[in-house]
Amino acid sequence: MNITEKAKKIADSCRFCWMCRHICPIGNATGQERNTARARSLGVSLVVRGATELKEIADNIYECTLCGACTNNCMTGWDPKVFVQEVKTEIILNGQTPDYIIKLLETYQASGNVFGASVCTCLDEAFATKSDVALFVGQDALYKAPKSVKNAVALLKKAGVEVALDKNQDSGAALCHQPSYQ
């Protein structure tokens, strides 16, 4: 596996450490040890040492959201996101990207959002409003909870705050960190 020495050092430093185990939101949501920075780093170190194949850890690596909770709470200063991002690049370069990730990226590139959805017409009035104040709600709210967005705009208006809503809200920086997207 072709990752930097820095990434290898971080993976080796994290693989037997339990310090951030309770921090990972994915690990907490799934209740699975495999969804922690420690388990991911152990998998990476096994691939680096030739004890397992890259394809064996691909799904696990892509289950990391790159939220940075592990990094922000690391008392020793390591940044597991470094090896996760580099390994994601390796997975793509080796043609081992999980099918669900390829589908997600294709949907995003084709439609501009990960849902492949159109914006609800119930927000047309909010999009037409011009204001010095912009409201950024993100794509989850825009596509999955448009009525909540409409209610938030109405609430702000009642409070005397006129807001402009932009249709072109990105789903965040996470997708832009995908090597295949860059």
Briefly describe each language-model feature range.
Residues 1-9, 19-22, 26:
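N-terminal structured subdomain of primase-like DNA metabolism proteins
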